[in-house]
């Protein structure tokens, strides 16, 4: 049985609410911040784990980074590809479950942003995701994990 976050219909219905105009407008600043705090240089590689619609992936690519986005929902990846094409940037997009994701490619930085973590039914599954992301990093690579507190979620989503 699929978990709720694996259901494509959920994301099709929820995405317009979760990713309103304000969320899209902040994406360039978020990407700049990621590049800055991870000390990334042009041409460095970034894994966007749980990239969804590509909101941040596209902006990171626009900053001359090589971006690979991974998501479990194919329609989200299709939307990310459309956004990348519209902005004239390249993304590598992979349809995969982060619980089983593995890459022979190693990244300078990995990000998991904006409520893309903590969906799994068990802590063990969440830890597997963290390990898989960590294992995808080059030695000395940076992992940026954004977690939303209960208070923040209540403020934004109620």
Where are these regions (language model features)?
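A short glycine-rich, Lys/Arg-flanked "PGG" loop and its adjoining helix->strand segment in the class I
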Residues: 127-139
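Short glycine-centered segments of the SAM/dcSAM-binding site in methyltransferase folds
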Residues: 45, 140-142
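Residues lining the SAM
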Residues: 113-115
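A short acidic, Gly/Pro-enriched loop at the edge of an enzyme's catalytic core
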Residues: 102-109
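Conserved class I S-adenosyl-L-methionine
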Residues: 1-41, 43-52, 142-158
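Class I SAM-dependent methyltransferase SAM/SAH-binding core
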Residues: 57-100
